[in-house]
UniProtKB/Swiss-Prot annotation:
It comes from Acidianus two-tailed virus (ATV). It comes from the Viruses. The keyword Membrane applies. This is Putative acetyltransferase ORF330. One of its GO terms (cellular component) is membrane. GO terms for molecular function: acyltransferase activity, transferring groups other than amino-acyl groups.
Amino acid sequence: MPSFVFKSRKLKHTTMQKNYDPRIAQLRGFASLSVAFYHLWTLQILPLSIFRPGWLGVPLFLELSIFLLLQRLDVNSDMKKYFAKRIKRIYPLYYLSATAVFLVELYYFHDHVTIYELFLHYVFLSSVLAPFSFSYVFWTLQLEEWMYLFIPLIHRLSDMRKFLLAVGLILSSFIYGTFIVTLPYNEFHLLYFMPPFWLSAYGWGIIAYILYKNNTKLWSTRSAISFLFLIYVMYLLAPTDNEFLYELTTRVVVYNMVLVVFMLIILNPPKVLSKVSVFLGEISYGIYVWHLLMEELLGVVGILLGVAVAFATEFPLRRKEILLRLRQLG
């Protein structure tokens, strides 16, 4: 990062950290489980208020995504390999899970779902053209797919232009979020899922990448996690009896504060808890796409089944890569 933006202190990154950081993988696991617990609250399976902030796992995913992909383009900027890896990594599980959810909704829950809606999922457009069709977890994956097209272009920019772009994304998202919370709930709920609300997560992910590339550390892990806990408490104390104040507090104030903290944690992640937590991070994509369906079918137990199905479907696709990474942990 240019020195006139932040004061920094140098870090020494190990070879393993530059190539693969298990602490980052662990963060992905935490994010997926956070969203899984959040859906226990939205489905009213286990409506505990402590699960309400769980949706914040989504922007953590988005920040990590652009942060990691920009790093990988530093190592190998070959576009064929970049897109081939994204397709191999995302498409098989995405199409399998989208089709499975469609069939369960149609034949088990007897919901009114159409082939057209399934087609929109297949071409990554359902989140915009048919929001809330038959599974609303796929909207984030569709946003990611479109973002994958822009990340190589962002990577080619100078650090200064990356930073200016990041600031633009953050400000536009903040203005958008502040505006939509003033609308009636039905309109807000729809616009909340649209891409503009989430662009700030990518903005902070870009800034995290610039800072990391320049070996800059801002806060200690303990300080960042302490601040994260305070934000969590702030979320739980948001006034639920006033819809406007609640959405303003949670979707604007807390959301934008937590994005900064996520950036700090990405730059200096907490230590690895165990191989299990890292492994959950490695199959976090599978956990994310399967957990909601399993919760709808089995309730609380659905979280465990979601992890099991993620293991059965994602692990075989990346078996060698995952096992190699786990061996690195010793």
